[in-house]
A protein has these predicted regions:
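Conserved, single-site charged/polar hotspot
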Residues: 1-173
């Protein structure tokens, strides 16, 4: 089996690829998500690690990897159920990766956006990539209660939106 070099606290640990994917999916998303979501995360995570030549660290700069002990601690009595579910996602996507023009893509992912994604070069020091372009993701606003959105209005725009030309901005707290 292929091994992934995972740097944790300046120590390099060599982990079987499937075991690594199990730990990454456990660390990157809730195991109670639907199987198809877990499978998508497996494919993204597998692609990510191949893009990095099977050498990563255990931080958000790479992918968060949980050990067996950490999974047992986090999942408690759900450990066997969640372990089996993620293992199934790994098995069902065996060898599936994402490529662009024959190369592994930079499979960057996040839990949710604020209604749209970012161009890769606007967020990372990177050249533009045709597959990492900003797109609308308005559904994120409804599925993630932690999302907030800030919008700026002129005083006149607010008066028009509230249909109140007498609105006194000096008393708005």
């Amino acid at each position: 089996a292929e091994k992934v070099a995972v740097t944790i606290d300046d120590n390099v640990n060599y982990v079987d690829l499937d075991d690594y994917l199990l730990g990454v999916v456990a660390g990157e998303m809730p195991a109670n998500f639907e199987l198809e979501a877990l499978k998508a995360q497996v494919v993204a995570s597998r692609t990510f690690v191949y893009n990095r030549n099977l050498s990563v660290d255990n931080t958000v700069n790479s992918q968060v990897y949980l050990s067996e002990d950490e999974m047992k601690k986090n999942w408690g009595d759900k450990y066997n159920e969640y372990h089996q579910k993620i293992s199934e996602a790994i098995k069902e996507t065996d060898n599936e990766v994402m490529k662009y023009q024959g190369e592994y893509i930079s499979a960057l992912f996040f839990s949710s956006s604020n209604g749209y994604t970012e161009n890769v070069e606007d967020y990372f020091e990177s050249s533009p990539l045709p597959y990492l372009r900003s797109v609308d993701s308005h559904w994120d606003l409804t599925i993630d209660p932690k999302n907030t959105r800030q919008t700026t209005f002129t005083k006149q725009e607010l008066k028009e939106k509230f249909n109140c030309q007498d609105l006194n901005f000096n008393i708005i707290a």
